[in-house]
Amino acid sequence: MKNSNYKKIANKVIDLEIEALKKLKKSLNISFDRAVNAIVKCQSKIILCGVGKSYLIASKIAATLSSVGCPSFSISANDCSHGNLGSISKKDLLIVISNSGNTQELIPVIKFANRYKITLIGIVSKKNSLLYKASDIKLVIPEVKEAGLGIVPTSSTCEQLAIGDCL
């Protein structure tokens, strides 16, 4: 591949992510206001959870929230299956991020939140998913075309990161 092709590929990726952000901007609604209010009113910890790339985005959002004075941390849904659910309490706010909303590792986290009536904000693309249905506040991320082969989350994680920065 010639070097000139690299720039074309980069421009295509950037264009796809710009389109994703435009769709996200148009999608903001009252649920976004409800999510911000829940964060502002939280008198305990804000816990962000995800799997894979969504977990990495959750970690960045948690770090950003902590930087502005909101006690926050991230937890991998994989770790929750091995005893880390004990770090979440009733007064906490739980934000779960998943593109599909049906990732198997999230099921124990979602059930735990519902069982103990922990406020759950779901950041998800699929409205027919377990995460969407179980969330108290639903932030729907528009489904978008991923860059490259379409198997690695690129545009969708760009949307997740942007909504986290907005929160």
Q: Model-predicted segments: where are they?
A:
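An N-terminal, well-structured beta->alpha segment
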Residues: K2-S44
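Glycine-rich phosphate-binding loops that contact phosphosugars or nucleotide phosphates
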Residues: S44-C166
